[in-house]
């Protein structure tokens, strides 16, 4: 049975939504959950019938979101540190954390190590498009990058799309301010030349292209990727609020909403980040899933499912094999 280490105390809302997510996941798939945190608090939240699927790793130090991640390596009793070490010591196959993302990234890189020929791990997240979803990386791990880093992100993203998303020939694009090869800054232009080596590279893409379903993997540095991600989340939130306001303005609008409610529910599901659960940190030797600090039970459940799917794949082997085929120096 696959064991997953869960940072049970790390989210913005404490342990309750995290444990509820674990419970929901256990009702749908079989795995062993190793809950890292205060056992006295956690045990009261677990139904008796699930006790055989639960283990506890004692940790009382919780990394606050406003604390500096540079201290992560010193705080060996933190929930994130102990969860990472469960994976390092092969007591768990993956970690899921909604805690301090900087501390998680730092500890995962230093304690678990990088894959062969990977200079920088990257956070990859799924964003909705008109047909399905687009994988975007990096969305926050690396604000400053070199062209070889972005090339490695492309290899990792392509491997994830093949192994996890089951896209046989994922279309890979580079985020830029225009589709033409001559557009972009020096980093974008240098990266474009490297990416030409990839058979599935379709060229530059503008920010709007992520939503039209013409690309499967979008490559960018973590600075621009994080802005793109947060902008997308903000636009989705504003559209939802505007729709609610308009629906309340008249009886006909309310009636129309009732008639179209199934379609609205489908739309909500399609754009809801909790449907994806979390973002894998690609490029480290083991599976690390970083969830949003505001994750509710559904997001935690789906993050666990991501971890299980990752551990059952050959993604890291695929990344190392693909990288060995290219010369990027």
From Swiss-Prot:
It catalyses: a fatty acyl-[ACP] + phosphate = an acyl phosphate + holo-[ACP]. Its main location: cytoplasm. One of its GO terms (biological process) is phospholipid biosynthetic process. GO terms for cellular component: cytoplasm. It comes from the Bacteria. Its EC number is 2.3.1.274. SUPFAM superfamilies: Isocitrate/Isopropylmalate dehydrogenase-like. InterPro entries: FA_synthesis, Phospholipid_synth_PlsX-like. Keywords: Cytoplasm, Lipid biosynthesis, Lipid metabolism, Phospholipid biosynthesis, Phospholipid metabolism, Transferase. It is found in: Cytoplasm. Pfam families: FA_synthesis. Pathway: Lipid metabolism; phospholipid metabolism. GO terms for molecular function: phosphate:acyl-[acyl carrier protein] acyltransferase activity. Homodimer. Probably interacts with PlsY. Belongs to the PlsX family. Catalyzes the reversible formation of acyl-phosphate (acyl-PO(4)) from acyl-[acyl-carrier-protein] (acyl-ACP). This enzyme utilizes acyl-ACP as fatty acyl donor, but not acyl-CoA. This is Phosphate acyltransferase. It comes from Campylobacter lari (strain RM2100 / D67 / ATCC BAA-1060).
């Amino acid at each position: 049975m696959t064991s997953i280490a869960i940072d049970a105390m790390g989210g913005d809302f404490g342990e309750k939504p995290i444990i509820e997510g674990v419970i929901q996941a256990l009702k749908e798939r079989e795995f062993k959950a190793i809950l890292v945190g205060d056992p006295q608090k956690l045990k009261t939240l677990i139904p008796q019938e699930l006790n055989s699927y639960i283990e506890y790793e004692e940790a009382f130090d919780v990394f606050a979101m406003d604390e500096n991640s540079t201290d992560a390596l010193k705080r060996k009793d933190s929930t994130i540190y102990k969860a990472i070490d469960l994976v390092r010591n092969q007591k768990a196959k993956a970690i899921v954390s909604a805690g301090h993302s900087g501390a998680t990234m730092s500890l995962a890189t230093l304690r678990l190590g990088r894959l062969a020929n990977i200079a920088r791990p990257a956070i990859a997240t799924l964003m909705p498009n008109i047909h399905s979803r687009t994988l975007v990386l990096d969305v926050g791990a690396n604000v400053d990058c070199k062209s070889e880093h972005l090339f490695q992100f492309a290899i990792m993203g392509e491997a994830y799309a093949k192994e996890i998303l089951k896209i046989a020939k994922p279309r890979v694009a580079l985020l830029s301010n225009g589709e033409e090869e001559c557009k972009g800054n020096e980093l974008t232009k240098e990266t474009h030349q490297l990416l030409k080596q990839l058979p599935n590279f379709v060229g530059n893409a503008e920010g709007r292209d992520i939503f039209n379903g013409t690309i499967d993997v979008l490559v960018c540095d973590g600075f621009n990727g994080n802005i793109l991600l947060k902008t997308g989340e903000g636009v989705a939130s504003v559209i939802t609020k505007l729709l609610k306001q308009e629906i309340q303005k008249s009886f006909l609008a309310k009636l129309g909403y009732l008639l179209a409610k199934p379609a609205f529910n489908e739309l909500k599901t399609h754009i809801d980040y909790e449907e994806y659960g979390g973002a894998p940190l690609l490029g480290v030797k083991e599976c690390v899933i970083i969830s949003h600090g505001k994750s509710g039970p559904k997001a935690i459940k789906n993050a666990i499912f991501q971890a299980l799917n990752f551990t059952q794949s050959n993604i890291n082997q695929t990344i190392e094999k693909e990288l060995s085929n290219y010369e990027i120096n």
